[in-house]
């Protein structure tokens, strides 16, 4: 819901020192985010998120991983992209971005057929979906853009207040009890976003078209990230009991085969895992931390902002047991800035895998450098205090 500059400003106002942009199929926000954080005295981490074929040739390919919509398809992120590599990243993402747009336009036809069958006015995909996006500036089109257009059409058609929830019931949309009141509130300023979340969790499957050729393999994502000096990650979701944003229904994901998953992650060269502490239980967090340590993987934490009700603060990360995650974040800030100056200053080394002890030492060296850069010290000067691995 925010531009990169607006997101950085809100993060700063909420007391954060690091903010990032990791958009679907796009690196387009990176330059603005980096500039905004520099002005605000913050650290930044930029990259992109992408869906990839995962576990090909293994039982994982037949399982639902961290993606509620598809079997054998995983969300991955590529973070800490050096500034000189942004153009190459944009070129690599372009074919998949275009293919996803075409698939989403086909889904829009299905959504409009549903609206028409309900006697409601359909939306204009170009004006109401593509037009509200940053696609023309290199941004991506996702199901959220589609569902925003559909949600707006439903609100226009059914009207606000109880009539909306009555109309949703007529459609067969299951509205969680926790959201029934806000969806019936005619004065709700976030109504479109609230309805979008409900549609994503409980209705998207009726119009969804599975991706095919647009998806790279997970191994290809890792290889590309390594080639540009960035860090590829698997985005751990974990079994969901309740979604804080209302956009995921209770469902089982990776927890039953997490050990097997980490073995495969290591086998394809993944050297990092990312997760969101507010969305997992203490037991899940302890397990993911233990597995990451056992496999020598950098742990990256953060929370994506999908709608304006979400807070920018993350109280979990203030707890003492998560101090290492904060240090890793600062190390990642240093990685992006320093490897933009000198590619040999990659946090994890351009190749190979660090031992848990070496990784901890590397983070302790880089975290203060990330803070220095956020405080305004020139990255080229800070680079003189860093060391390369290979």
Language model regions located:
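Outer-membrane beta-barrel translocator/channel fold
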Residues: 310-318
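Active-site gating loops and adjacent loop-to-helix segments of metal-dependent hydrolytic enzymes
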Residues: 56-99, 148-206, 318-339, 346-347
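Phosphodiester-processing cores and adjacent nucleic acid-binding clamps
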Residues: 19, 42-59, 71-79, 104-106, ...
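Short, charged low-complexity intrinsically disordered segments located at boundaries
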Residues: 135-146, 181-183, 359-364
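Non-catalytic, alpha-helical, charged scaffold/linker segments
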Residues: 84-176, 370-389
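Charged, amphipathic alpha-helical linkers/stalks
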Residues: 84-92, 106-109, 342-363
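An N-terminally biased module of ancient metal coordination in phosphate/nucleic-acid-related enzymes
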Residues: 1-72, 196-224, 228-229, 234-310, ...
């Amino acid at each position: 819901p925010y531009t990169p500059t607006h997101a950085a400003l809100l993060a700063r106002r909420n007391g954060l020192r690091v903010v990032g942009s990791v958009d679907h199929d796009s690196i387009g926000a990176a330059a603005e985010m980096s500039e905004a954080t520099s002005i605000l005295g913050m650290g930044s981490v930029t990259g992109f998120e992408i869906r990839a074929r995962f576990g090909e040739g293994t039982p994982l390919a037949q399982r639902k991983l961290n993606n509620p919509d598809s079997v054998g398809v995983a969300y991955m992120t590529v973070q800490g992209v050096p500034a000189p590599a942004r153009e190459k990243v944009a070129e690599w993402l372009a074919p998949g971005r275009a293919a996803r747009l075409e698939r989403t336009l086909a889904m829009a036809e299905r959504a409009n057929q549903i609206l028409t069958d309900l006697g409601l006015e359909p939306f204009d995909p170009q004006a109401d979906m593509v037009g509200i996006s940053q696609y023309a500036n290199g941004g991506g089109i996702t199901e959220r853009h589609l569902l925003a257009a559909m949600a707006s059409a439903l609100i226009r058609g059914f009207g606000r207040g109880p009539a909306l929830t009555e109309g949703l019931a007529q459609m067969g949309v299951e509205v969680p009890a926790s959201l029934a009141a806000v969806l019936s509130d005619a004065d709700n300023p976030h109504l479109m976003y609230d309805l979008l979340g409900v549609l994503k969790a409980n209705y998207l499957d009726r119009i969804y078209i599975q991706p095919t050729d647009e998806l790279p393999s997970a191994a290809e994502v890792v290889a590309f990230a390594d080639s540009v000096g960035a860090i590829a990650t698997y985005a751990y979701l974990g079994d969901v009991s309740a979604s804080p944003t209302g956009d995921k229904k209770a469902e089982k994901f990776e927890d039953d085969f997490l050990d097997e998953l980490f073995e495969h992650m290591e086998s394809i060269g993944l050297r990092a895992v990312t997760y969101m502490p507010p969305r997992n239980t203490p037991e899940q967090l302890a397990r993911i931390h233990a597995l990451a340590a056992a496999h020598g993987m950098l742990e990256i934490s953060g929370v994506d902002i999908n709608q304006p009700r979400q807070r920018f603060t993350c109280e979990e990360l203030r707890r003492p047991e998560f101090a290492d995650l904060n240090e890793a974040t600062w190390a990642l800030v240093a990685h992006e800035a320093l490897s933009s100056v000198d590619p040999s200053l990659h946090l994890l080394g351009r190749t190979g895998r660090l031992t848990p002890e070496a990784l901890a030492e590397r983070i302790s060296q880089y975290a203060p450098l990330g803070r220095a850069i956020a405080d305004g010290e020139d990255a080229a000067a800070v680079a003189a205090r860093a060391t390369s691995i290979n």
